[in-house]
Amino acid sequence: MIIDINHSGIVVPNLEIAIDFYTKIIRLKLVEIRERDGAGISQVLGYKDTQIKVADVSTSTGQIIELIEYINPSPQNAKSNERAELTASHIAFNVTNIQESYEFLIQNGGISLNPAKFME
């Protein structure tokens, strides 16, 4: 039975830029930065000789988001179907005003893949 969300993980192309965005713009707290490699992480992620850099950032309520940068396999050198697997769908935050939050993110370097549509 699910009782809560432990954490979410999203793949980013550059960990340092992602840390800046999530801590300075979204204002999450940086908890930890670490590197992982070896047989264990290779088995979990399903890639031979996997090497990743990970930063944990936390919301004010303690929800953890893992920002993951792949070192090996390199997303640029992976086959197209593998590149698609080195991503995450999305992450959703509860906010007080969605339109203001959207505009704030765009003004501070956020990218919208589609025009925003706000529902009443």
Question: Across the structure, where does each feature detected by a protein language model lie?
Answer:
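A generic structural micro-feature
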Residues: 2, 46-49, 82-85
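Short N-terminal helix-initiation segments at or just after the protein's N-terminus
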Residues: 1-9, 28-42, 73-81
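Vicinal oxygen chelate
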Residues: 13-16, 31-32, 59-63, 69-120
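Short, solvent-exposed beta-strand edge segments and adjacent coil->beta transition regions
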Residues: 5-7, 52, 86-90
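Short secondary-structure boundary segments
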Residues: 1-15, 47, 116
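Core segments of cupin and vicinal oxygen chelate
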Residues: 11-62, 100, 107
